[in-house]
């Protein structure tokens, strides 16, 4: 059994917006309200970022066309006592999916926690102290 940090990506559609900033604000408020209704205040909500295929620069994942906005949102949560990476992903999607019922959720990133910290191998200092 392991503990994981799971980051899910969600596309949020908002209507009647005039600008990207307004779309972002409405999308974040919509997600936070839905999570609070289900008492999921432990889920961190962040604006998603996309990468330009030409220059590689990062920009906010928010677009407005015809007063309709599409905003990419990252949802981060810790999953405890999962049997595997796939199990942690399913748990995270089930938990967040309760609040965001008709929003497709995609795994963006997942990391295993070791002793409450993100894992990823041993550092030089830890190896040297031996």
From Swiss-Prot:
InterPro entries associated with the record: UPF0212
Short name of one Pfam family: DUF555
Top-level division of the source organism's lineage: Archaea
Family recorded in the similarity comment: Belongs to the UPF0212 family.
UniProt xrefs under HAMAP family: UPF0212
Protein name (Swiss-Prot/TrEMBL): UPF0212 protein PF1486
Species for this entry: Pyrococcus furiosus (strain ATCC 43587 / DSM 3638 / JCM 8422 / Vc1)
């Amino acid at each position: 059994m392991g503990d994981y940090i799971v980051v899910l990506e969600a596309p949020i559609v908002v209507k009647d917006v005039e600008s990207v900033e307004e779309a972002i604000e409405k999308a974040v408020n919509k997600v936070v309200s839905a999570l609070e209704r289900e008492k999921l205040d432990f889920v961190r909500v962040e604006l998603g970022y996309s990468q330009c295929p030409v220059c590689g620069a990062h920009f906010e994942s928010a677009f407005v066309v015809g007063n309709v906005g599409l905003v990419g949102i990252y949802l981060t949560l810790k999953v405890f006592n999962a049997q595997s990476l796939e199990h942690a992903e399913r748990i995270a999607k089930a938990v967040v999916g309760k609040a965001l019922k008709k929003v497709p959720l995609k795994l963006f990133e997942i990391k295993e926690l070791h002793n409450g910290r993100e894992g990823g191998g041993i550092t030089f200092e830890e190896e040297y102290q031996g």
